[in-house]
Amino acid sequence: MALLSDLVNLDLSSITDKIIAEYIWIGGSGMDLRSKARTLSGPVSDPSELPKWNYDGSSTGQAPGEDSEVIIYPQAIFKDPFRRGNHILVMCDAYTPAGEPIPTNKRAAAAKIFSNPEVEKEVTWYGIEQEYTLLQKDTNWPLGWPLGGFPGPQGPYYCGIGADKAFGRDIVDAHYKACLYAGVNISGINGEVMPGQWEFQVGPSVGIAAADQIWVARYILERITEIYGVVVSFDPKPIPGDWNGAGAHTNYSTKTMREEGGYEVIKKAIEKLGLRHKEHIAAYGEGNERRLTGRHETADINTFLWGVANRGASIRVGRDTEKEGKGYFEDRRPASNMDPYVVTSMIAETTILWDNKS
């Protein structure tokens, strides 16, 4: 095993300029991540320097066998925390050979929204709180839970410490540091209300970069749990009953919201979000109806409600924002399995581009 570990950690920089690029893309479910690696002649610093590539879409549920080639376009580069050195992770999106985005490519539509001049001038900031649950591989039961049984009631686990309250901290800390190494703008972690559930935060990041970073952070997390022999679940309600679900609360602000008088801009934006509540809910993650019940710090899925410091609301405004008259708000509706390209761009589209008077 020591030899294998030595080879895995082999430093190639002293013998070759060649690097390994791990191309990452989203698979056929819209939630599964796939990746494969290729050798490049030397270090690169921009996605435009990278070649496009292809994969067998019939094996990912994204193309028929008789016309299976899907083309991936490099979009964002991150340092590889697993291979280290000059090796890189490359976030890609997927297209047909004719250059059309395939149905699971939500990045292309998001990029159009974020490149709109009206959106660009607002310099949209996002801070996304990604919750997830760690599961025992052989049983699909949360880490730290007795097999076929339940731990004590919720209460001591949120931000808890101790062997009877925090399960999987090594994984969480490894992920935190790996994301920082990679260049993901990860801003924090914490244990969640349900035991075995954790959260990491990404942001504030501007525009589509926030979504790229969430996807790469998810990829890094999946790779780390693979090493540990643990399964990560993004199911919004992994355990039925009196247990918290898992969300991806999305904090958002625009330039005008962050300036003097921004609170009025925030209230107008929230009004627009309320008018398009059904459209947003439909795009905010599969199975979200199991989570948004009006209990466990959620609003009912059929009701739009906003409030200051109200964690039972659809949209929460912080006390500091109310006091200062400017700042940001939190959309608490997105599920943990949401597509960040969809959620971030839809919030921008509704609050900046959508005319609720037309």
From Swiss-Prot:
Residues 38-66 are annotated as: Disordered. It is found in: Cytoplasm. Residues 106-358 form the GS catalytic domain. SUPFAM superfamilies: Glutamine synthetase, N-terminal domain (SSF54368), Glutamine synthetase/guanido kinase (SSF55931). It comes from the Eukaryota. Belongs to the glutamine synthetase family. Homooctamer. This is Glutamine synthetase. Irreversibly inhibited by the herbicide L-phosphinothricin (PPT). Keywords: ATP-binding, Cytoplasm, Ligase, Nucleotide-binding. It catalyses: L-glutamate + NH4(+) + ATP = L-glutamine + ADP + phosphate + H(+). Its EC number is 6.3.1.2. Pfam families: Gln-synt_C. Gene3D superfamilies: Glutamine synthetase, N-terminal domain, Glutamine synthetase/guanido kinase, catalytic domain. Disulfide bonds: none annotated. InterPro entries: Gln_synt_N (IPR008147), Gln_synt_N_sf (IPR036651), Gln_synth/guanido_kin_cat_dom (IPR014746), Gln_synth_cat_dom (IPR008146), Gln_synth_gly_rich_site (IPR027303), Gln_synth_N_conserv_site (IPR027302), Glutamine_Synthetase (IPR050292). GO terms for molecular function: ATP binding; glutamine synthetase activity. One of its GO terms (biological process) is glutamine biosynthetic process. One of its GO terms (cellular component) is cytoplasm. It comes from Lactuca sativa.
